[in-house]
Amino acid sequence: ESDYSLSFPHPKKVRGREIDTLGYLISNHNIRRSAYDSIKHFDNVNFQTGQGVVKVTTDAQKTTVTLENGKVLTAKVLIAADSRFSNTRRQLGISTDMHDFGRTVMVFRTEHTLPNNETATECFFYGRTLAFLPLGDYMTNCVVTIDSHRAQEILGLSREQLGAEMMRMLSNRFGEMKVISDVHSYPLVGVHARSFVAERSALIGDASVGMHPVTAHGFNLGLAGADILATVISEAHACGEDFSSQEVLKRYERKHMPHTLFLFHGTNAIVKLCTNEQTPARLLRSAVVRLSNNLPPVKFLISRQLTGF
């Protein structure tokens, strides 16, 4: 293990506008609440909560979705965003490139006595990866990734023991740490759909790309995909085109997929290098980190990928 670090300076400009940060971290429940509040007043939005999709069919005229309660919905276009293990995607006949990392991710929130300086920190240790994501000066979201057969080493700890373990792993950088939430865990599987569209259908969010969390960029890709698809459909509708046609939906795929493929496979390659404990891999990653740290163009390219397309 090495205490050498790769750091990224604040970017100055993205897409022609001034910025002073790589990004912001926002709790998921706040995003969901804001999304709901932004559309709940629209009369043409109908929420079907607590109902799973049991059947999906498409034809030349429409898409049809059958819910668990037996209700049947029809539309010109079906947009699926039902997780990286999407049942809808499977029913549409879209295959995926899937990589099971054999690891378990655990997420929990902590409070601490020393500030995090609003800086995200990622630590690659042998056998586990730690990410510390600032939610406030003295509040940090912790993400622990560990081989699945060793997950109980973390899941079996009390809150007090877990806080002490984080302090040890961080060498007390945040001072005394206190776990203030439950520990949530899930298997780590990366997924990239081989197509983002099918007949009268499109995939967005994790149904299209489920990223490794090391870049904290998966949600951003989901937002980008939704924005690109909405723009493509709106422009086609304004021009009098059939926005549900394959020709139109393929425009979304052509605009979005090249970027997601680069990030998906590039991230997986980095993770493989950083978690390989063989001696050649250790030497290579040490050289890569040191080289990258001293090549501003490389840092700029990485920052650009994480802040804008």
Language-model features: locations:
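Short, solvent-exposed loop/helix junctions and linker helices
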Residues: 24-29, 156, 223, 278
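Conserved FAD-binding catalytic core of PHBH/FMO-like flavoproteins
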Residues: 62-64, 72, 77-183
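Conserved N-terminal helical subregion
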Residues: 1-91, 99-104
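C-terminal helical "tail/cap" subdomain of flavin- and related membrane-associated enzymes
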Residues: 231-309
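A short, flexible beta-alpha/helix-coil linker loop
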Residues: 13-16, 113, 147-151, 208-210
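FAD/FMN-dependent oxidoreductases across multiple families
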Residues: 152-239, 243-244
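A general structural signal for well-ordered alpha-helical segments in protein cores
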Residues: 28-32, 36, 103, 107, ...
